[in-house]
Amino acid sequence: MKLQYRTESALLIPLLTEVKKLLEHLKKEQINPSIIEEIKKYRQKYADTADTSQTSLRYLYYGKEIWEAAVHALLCGENLLLAGSKATGKNVLAENLARAFRRPCYNLSFHINMDASSMIGNDTFRNGEVVFRPGPIYQSAVDGGFCILDEINMARN
């Protein structure tokens, strides 16, 4: 499946702050209305654990077929592996999906010195006690969030 984009101002649009605007964007992209309804049902079902943070999307993702395939996979309980050249919108899509589903989004950029504790969590001292400090993968799982594992090819084997 190829990523498809519009070239309007390099795919960038001004900051958006409401999920409603994202759903309007999906309608303009002519995403199958039943898929948009399924997103809404999901959001209602998990409204009590929804991400209510005020962070805004910087960009919108364009690409009807990719949107539909990604949402369908997520609704079926699958994980996504987005692979492709640099600057093709993989992170933008992941952030848009997290916002559409109203889930928290955690971004973890891999590097050569990364170890398991920086991803999952580690012990630390707090108030004279050893306590577990969760990493982004652990926290994402606890919160039912989206975890973007960026530049995974840069990690040590």
How does the language model describe each region?
Residues 2-157:
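AAA+ P-loop NTPase catalytic core and its hallmark functional loops
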